[in-house]
Amino acid sequence: MLSVVENGLDPQAAIPVIKKKLVGSVKALQKQYVSLDTVVTSEDGDANTMCSALEAVFIHGLHAKHIRAEAGGKRKKSAHQKPLPQPVFWPLLKAVTHKHIISELEHLTFVNTDVGRCRAWLRLALNDGLMECYLKLLLQEQARLHEYYQPTALLRDAEEGEFLLSFLQGLTSLSFELSYKSAILNEWTLTPLALSGLCPLSELDPLSTSGAELQRKESLDSISHSSGSEDIEVHHSGHKIRRNQKLTASSLSLDTASSSQLSCSLNSDSCLLQENGSKSPDHCEEPMSCDSDLGTANAEDSDRSLQEVLLEFSKAQVNSVPTNGLSQETEIPTPQASLSLHGLNTSTYLHCEAPAEPLPAQAASGTQDGVHVQEPRPQAPSPLDLQQPVESTSGQQPSSTVSETAREVGQGNGLQKAQAHDGAGLKLVVSSPTSPKNKSWISEDDFYRPSREQPLESASDHPIASYRGTPGSRPGLHRHFSQEPRKNCSLGALDQACVPSPGRRQAQAAPSQGHKSFRVVHRRQMGLSNPFRGLMKLGTVERRGAMGIWKELFCELSPLEFRLYLSNEEHTCVENCSLLRCESVGPAHSDGRFELVFSGKKLALRASSQDEAEDWLDRVREALQKVRPQQEDEWVNVQYPDQPEEPPEAPQGCLSPSDLLSEPAALQGTQFDWSSAQVPEPDAIKESLLYLYMDRTWMPYIFSLSLEALKCFRIRNNEKMLSDSHGVETIRDILPDTSLGGPSFFKIITAKAVLKLQAGNAEEAALWRDLVRKVLASYLETAEEAVTLGGSLDENCQEVLKFATRENGFLLQYLVAIPMEKGLDSQGCFCAGCSRQIGFSFVRPKLCAFSGLYYCDICHQDDASVIPARIIHNWDLTKRPICRQALKFLTQIRAQPLINLQMVNASLYEHVERMHLIGRRREQLKLLGDYLGLCRSGALKELSKRLNHRNYLLESPHRFSVADLQQIADGVYEGFLKALIEFASQHVYHCDLCTQRGFICQICQHHDIIFPFEFDTTVRCAECKTVFHQSCQAVVKKGCPRCARRRKYQEQNIFA
């Protein structure tokens, strides 16, 4: 077993080192990505540093029995090297991880060790945003921590654990897409072991060792294998290459002074990086060329191997640049620069450093290869990172950089071999992917070159000769492409996409200042903040009514809707127009008037001034451009004036330049695999494979439509995994979107996002649109049926209910029906509010008593409320915890009489004495309301104030609101009704007009005036509504005298 103190740092001394690395890397990531919409990938050096620091957190303080020596015989070690320790804590991680995640990690193709699963688990947890949750669960498992860690371990320290939890909260603002399927993860690298104290920290710095020997292999932490592409970047740390070592793309990554970097395109299925002595996954006999175990090398060996490297590159055209005592650099494109996969935002260059005084042999060698050298002219620095450009003859091609459009050409996975000139030192440099994007509104991509008709200076007037994008002018590069067996891109596509060389750009920049040959295209660039978050504009406008009268209203403009309210204080919506139905936007007049025309409706509005009206119109147009189907912004294609009219033909299987300028959606549907052998969901009305457009690419998902939700599944290990779920109530509209490429494209607009989808053919897309519309219609009919339980509603109630139904309409069904708890599996372990993962080893789920659904701790904060359905059916007055969504819904409809108790459960009056008394008082109040409504004294207005504007109490005795049920549960409703009855009855007794509307008992003929609301002393005929004394009616027992007279008169009329 290995001792931590003997081989590395003291356990207590390692903790601040780990914290320093973690804090620095997270702060760097936040500073770079927090204001961008891009994701953090494994190509970022700070992300790799953060992963190493987190790995050190889990390694620090492990018991010796969980640390074993390096796996036997996988790498060949020299006599000076010691085996790296291999700590394993995979069983600990399995205790807090969901079974689906464990199954996925254990079935990865190239990750086949427990060490690899530990490292893959950490990166997958960062991708899913669950690192904080996992760590919280681990800190609660004290028994397991005691089993795996020493008392001095970082995870055993309560204060350090709290620090980690609070610090990892900063990762919630970042989105990760780290690689976790690479075979590189199968063994530990040096960095986490050194940070945790298992290895000396001095081994992290290769310059700290002697210049003749390297005691330890370099760390592979900077090796980045993006899981979403097939690009692998190898960053070597200044190590020498043995003179007998085979020269490959990876061994050509040299820099005698500092580290150099190489971006190579590898097939992730067959050419994954391995350690020295290991075999590739396809069991090839020859060790992989990316081995970093270099053994012992001296300076002379390095120089000789460098010459061999330069000889290997001798077939390519390179500009040899002699200078007068100054080291100058120029750049030429490498094949990797033009064949980088889509999504890699780096450009690769070969920097040729010329010596201060070139040797004659070198000059001769350059001449033999066809490279002519001339004295350079002093020039100003170019904006494209060219330190000092050089001059070339007409026979020599200048260097050029590759535009971002050309970087997206390559989709192949062949390993491209670079070639370079023999006479100068080479430095292969990949621009850092972590460099921040230009946030300016105008970039170099926004500039057009002068038109072809514009006369240009001759080649002799420029320090750099004109460029010809033909294969013949670049024989070396063309020969390289013709010999490459895995070519995937045409040279013509590369040449068309190339940006002018730095020298030529500088040469043309000077005259452009005087003649203004450039023109700037103003367009918003990628990576800037999204302006469509929340409300786009709000304020006060006036609307012209039917009679030409202007009424002041409060207006809100959102990315999808244009809403008008009565006032800012009283947030009652009077008009709600969907921008999807907007037909035209009128101009702004001098007095501030403007018009908005929707389908079947025209809004005549007036702002305070013309400028304010124009601002409203600009915001509306901006929202319309966002919400409507629009063609993508055209890319700027920078071409040379003297470029041939017809570029060379592209080989088969290659994207043409027109494909580069088009939306990825325009690709042919034959490239997609539409087969799916998954079993449909039990409640699915329609389920099929659709392609979803996200992150500028089409991804396959299985969509399942039911009467309740539209679910989105992704396929992992031939199993369906729920990715997202959209309730039917959140679907706003479904529209065809032929602008994406054809009739098979459509989009679904939901409350959370706009889903751009592609079906297999136009008929399939039409079927999806028809079924989604039918499900929406069924849902709306169900909502209307639920509303009818409350009887007829006034206009205000309808508007409020419409607003509440639009946001949380699915909750309306639970207003009068007790919910059935379906279980967490029916939700796919996702929160019903925010789609966050909940359940075992995730956030603890919380049950909402109102809807019977499960929510996370953010959407459910244990707000207590009575459940209306339980009061109606079970007379359960207990307050139960409900989610924030249900609380908001109950607050919105609190004062609306949506529950008709006579229709829902009339037996409640019979079985509950309190409800029987409440029912009688509600009937009394209704009868008193009839009297006060006919009185001209204004008593009805006073009664309305006492009712708190609940006028429905005077209209129907059986309509109840949520506020009524809450007061019944609190025991104050009976007193509230009693006070109203006393006030109204006192008015009737003392009002001359109301007294004249009383009754005289027709049985006893007494002169006392009686009223129908006196339930204790009077009785009323159900047929003619005549009122009698109860005692008189009980003595006579002959029924109603008035009804008897009416029947007698009718019989006489019949006989007559």
From Swiss-Prot:
Record InterPro entries: DEF8, PE/DAG-bd, PH-like_dom_sf, PH_domain, PLEKHM1_PH, RH_dom, Run_dom, Run_dom_sf
Stretch list, region Disordered: 215-245, 277-303, 360-422, 451-483
Tissue expression remark: Expressed in placenta, liver, prostate, thymus, spleen, ovary, colon, colon carcinoma and peripheral blood lymphocytes (PBL). Weakly expressed in brain, lung, kidney, and testis. No expression in heart, skeletal muscle, pancreas and small intestine. Predominantly expressed in the breast carcinoma cell line MCF-7.
Domain RUN, residue spans: 41-183
Function (record text): Acts as a multivalent adapter protein that regulates Rab7-dependent and HOPS complex-dependent fusion events in the endolysosomal system and couples autophagic and the endocytic trafficking pathways. Acts as a dual effector of RAB7A and ARL8B that simultaneously binds these GTPases, bringing about clustering and fusion of late endosomes and lysosomes. Required for late stages of endolysosomal maturation, facilitating both endocytosis-mediated degradation of growth factor receptors and autophagosome clearance. (Microbial infection) In case of infection contributes to Salmonella typhimurium pathogenesis by supporting the integrity of the Salmonella-containing vacuole (SCV) probably in concert with the HOPS complex and Rab7.
Notes on the domains: The LIR (LC3-interacting region) motif mediates the interaction with ATG8 family proteins GABARAP, GABARAPL, GABARAPL2, and LC3A/B/C.
Name of this chain's protein: Pleckstrin homology domain-containing family M member 1
